[in-house]
């Protein structure tokens, strides 16, 4: 009757565990004293408050204009970013990783003429991007359209290989390579 390898391994493991319980490293935990209390902190001396006159307001520049009549009705989010570059169809063509509402998908943007500009192919895209049929470049703006020619989303380049914008429903959408 021989001893199997599993039995021998179990016996060795039990011996190691029991030997660990006999260690003197854990035996003196009852004799450990707490650290000494920290030294007291001295109070900060209180100074006196001095009184002085403020400078005349006429020596400061004028406040910016608050005339809102020229800007009424303008949606700031719809304005193009000042740093956005002008786009070309060649810069947009290709396959993009799209992100909408925390979900992601892929969008193919070949330079095949279709509808408002060029054909677009969404692959398992969520929400409004599922209706995507075409795309077009309009100056600094990339516009995505549905099959009826309605705008699905408007985006601007926010860096090399990245577009950020909103769907017509107001959801943030990002395209990246």
UniProtKB/Swiss-Prot annotation:
The record's section on Pfam families has: Inh
Keywords (alphabetical) are:
Cell outer membrane, Lipoprotein, Membrane, Palmitate, Signal
Q: Which stretches does UniProt call biased (Polar residues)? A: 50-77
Q: Where is this region: Disordered?
A: 28-79
Per UniProt, subcellular location reads as:
Cell outer membrane
InterPro entries assigned:
Inh/Omp19, OM_lipoprot_Omp19_bac, Protease_inh_b-brl_dom
Q: Which residues form a coiled coil?
A: none
Query: Could you tell me the membrane topology recorded for this protein?
Result: Lipid-anchor
Q: Which sites carry lipid of kind S-diacylglycerol cysteine?
A: 21
Q: Name one GO molecular function term.
A: endopeptidase inhibitor activity
Cellular component per GO, a single term? cell outer membrane
- Where, by residue number, does the polypeptide cross the bilayer? none
Lipidation sites, kind N-palmitoyl cysteine, are: 21
Q: Which GO terms describe its biological process?
A: positive regulation of immune response
| Signal peptide (from-to) | 1-20
Family membership noted in the UniProt record: Belongs to the rhizobiaceae omp19 lipoprotein family.
* Further details from the record: Elicits an immune response in humans, mice, sheep and goats infected with B.melitensis or B.abortus, but not in B.abortus-infected cattle.
Q: Please give the name of this protein.
A: Outer membrane lipoprotein omp19
Organism expressing this protein natively: Brucella abortus (strain 2308)
Query: Mind giving the lineage of the organism this protein is from?
Result: Bacteria, Pseudomonadati, Pseudomonadota, Alphaproteobacteria, Hyphomicrobiales
């Amino acid at each position: 009757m021989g001893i199997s390898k599993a039995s021998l391994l179990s016996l060795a493991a039990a011996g190691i565990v029991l030997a660990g319980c006999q260690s003197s490293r854990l035996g003196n935990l009852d004799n450990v004293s707490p650290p000494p209390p920290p030294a007291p902190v001295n109070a900060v001396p209180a100074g006196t408050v001095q009184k002085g006159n403020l400078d005349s307001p006429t020596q400061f520049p004028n406040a910016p204009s608050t005339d809102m009549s020229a800007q009424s009705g303008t949606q700031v989010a719809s304005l193009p970013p000042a740093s956005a570059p002008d786009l070309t169809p060649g810069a947009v063509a290709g396959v993009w990783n799209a992100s909408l509402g925390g979900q992601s998908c892929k969008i193919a943007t070949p330079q095949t003429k279709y509808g408002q500009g060029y054909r677009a192919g969404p692959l398992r895209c969520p929400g409004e991007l599922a209706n995507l049929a075409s795309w077009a470049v309009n100056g600094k703006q990339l516009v995505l359209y549905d099959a009826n020619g309605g705008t699905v989303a408007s985006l601007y380049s926010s860096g090399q290989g990245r577009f950020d914008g909103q769907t017509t429903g107001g959801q943030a959408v990002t395209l990246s390579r």
